[in-house]
Amino acid sequence: MRGTTNGADDMSGELELSILGVAGKERPDGAVDININSSRGEINGILHTCEGQPGAVIYVGGALGGLDGPADGLYPKLARELSGPGGMTGLRLHYRQPGEFEECVLDVLGGVSFLRGVGAQRVVLVGHSFGAAVVIKAGELSDAVIGVAALSPQLYGTRTVERLAPRSLLLVHGTADRVLDAEASRDIHARAKEPKRLELYDGAGHSLRSCAEELFELAKSWLLETIASGANETENDNAV
């Protein structure tokens, strides 16, 4: 896949990442440690497979990377819960070069390409903090992406968020975030096109730990609804 970049927003100079191979090793919990060998280095992650389902989610962390996400391990909780019957495959992805915006966008696009290669037809992206801007940009660049959830997002990298439409956008922020003010989500929401949704949690900080249970339920329902709406659109397109 190819991304283009001249700064985080314009993405006008070309960058390219090709997948050369994939290796996997099953974990005791049934998930799979995934190593994606790319033309720009190795991308590692944990895959939670949902057999026979066409929907998939990629989860990415903040500027330091990581696999667990905010809110006391939101990502593994969601990935395990949603990999059951009628759910969706989840890929918890770690960046090759944490904090390097364009490279991290390419990592997410590489994850999308991998998921498409194993049968996913519709992909949703979830990111926290720095990673929220990463998934917004990656969503703009991939036709396979049907929705993006941005948790406690930064503004840098989101200037062209209007290009995300018609993909669904969920923005979540805590009103007591002292790392990235909730005004960032308000600003992104104001510039984004429909369909979009903004959820603010009163008193929650950057990690969203104090609203972990509410966030889990919100994210779960939104992911299921977004994947289902993507399926309905596909059926309508096929009927035309």
Predicted regions and their residues:
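Catalytic histidine neighborhood in serine/cysteine hydrolases
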Residues: 191-207
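Primarily recognizes the serine-hydrolase "nucleophile elbow" in alpha/beta-hydrolase
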Residues: 112-167
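Alpha/beta-hydrolase active-site loop
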Residues: 99-118
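N-terminal cap/lid segment of alpha/beta-hydrolase-fold proteins
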Residues: 2-52
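Short beta-strand/loop motif that positions the catalytic acidic residue
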Residues: 164-165, 170-173, 177
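Short, surface-exposed "cap/lid" segments of acyl-processing enzymes
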Residues: 40-42, 50-90
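Short alpha-helix in the alpha/beta-hydrolase fold that links the catalytic acid
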Residues: 181-190
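Catalytic histidine-centered segment of alpha/beta-hydrolase-like enzymes
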Residues: 204-216
